[in-house]
Amino acid sequence: MSNNIGSFWNKWDLHIHSPYTNMNNRYNCGIDLFCQTVKDKDIKVIGLTNYFIIQENEYNEVVAELGNDVYVIPNIEFRTNDTNGSGEYINIHVLFNPDNISIKAINDTLARIRLNNIASATAVYCSYESINSIGFDKVTISVDSLIAQLKSDFNPSDYLIIGVPNGYGGFHPNSKPRSVELAKKLDELSHAMFGRKEDTEFFLSTDNGRAQL
């Protein structure tokens, strides 16, 4: 029997923090109400986002509460060592394939990465216990170290790197050579971008030697 339904259009939100977020927590509700709101908005796929680490209990609770209504992708947001023209630390996101790797495997890999402690000389690694001991706002990560560890432990189909060109922590460059070179580097590393309609012209531009994407 032929299927004449045609295309399905589903709503995705790949950058959504839960009440378990490690920083900037403005929620006044629990996971149950958070998940109900997601379902009420008819969102079919979410990128469950947290800074540096997603703990197993957060992911498992959200998945259990959403059930089969919503597909949940772990999205870890990293504040990098690099800064943009406004002096803000640049953020990048890594989305992990939950069908291929577990939250434990993700966290075991990240825990091997030494972070930059911007507050003191104390060694800190990318694990919840280590970061929480000094504060999530006190650490940044080397992009090169992150990428090297991901490539060492995972297959290309296990994760996607998402760049953030605009907004707080975005890498949209000014005219300074270092800013342009940094934007080119993040262009090349990123599999996709969290962007706006207005970003199209920027990413199609070949100004300042940037390769057309």
Question: Which role does the model predict for each range below?
Answer:
Residues 4-129, 133:
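A metal-dependent hydrolase metal-coordination microenvironment
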Residues 1-30, 57, 112-213:
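Domain-core and long-helix interface of multi-subunit machines
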